[in-house]
Amino acid sequence: MNLLVIGNAISMVGCLIMVIIGFLKKKNHILVAQCAQCMFMGVGNLVLGGISGFICNIVTILRNLVFLRFRNTNLMKISFILLQFVLSIGTLSAGWISWLPILAAALFTWCMDTQSEVRLKIVILCTQVMWLTYDLYYLNYVASAFDVMTMVSNLIGLYMVSKKKA
């Protein structure tokens, strides 16, 4: 029970940073804050037994640090997706559920530089469904609640974009 509380408390810090990121304007500030978010979310996953989620968050930190310095190219995206798969391959003890963070990170990494607001929101929705399933499996209730809120805000955003185009 103590690890459940500790893991969820650590994840809460990451979730609060995620909310703060919504107020940041500069890409560099967002990437740095996302590194802090991923550190807390990753440690929360690790405490709760979610090893592949931890690895995905660590690779996301590395990806963000590299993208702060270098241009985001398809070769770099493919490299990070492959790194994600290679590092996670030994941590798939929970079966298909272990693949969800890996697939979510791969999808987001590939689509993160899209110019289409609609496409990005749909990608975020898809990845959040994967993370929600994973977080519920590992009893990360705090992250699950924020996953749902992220999905709702993106659905509202999609609705607003569609009304603007109509």
Label the predicted regions:
Residues M1-A166:
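Alpha-helical membrane-protein topology signature
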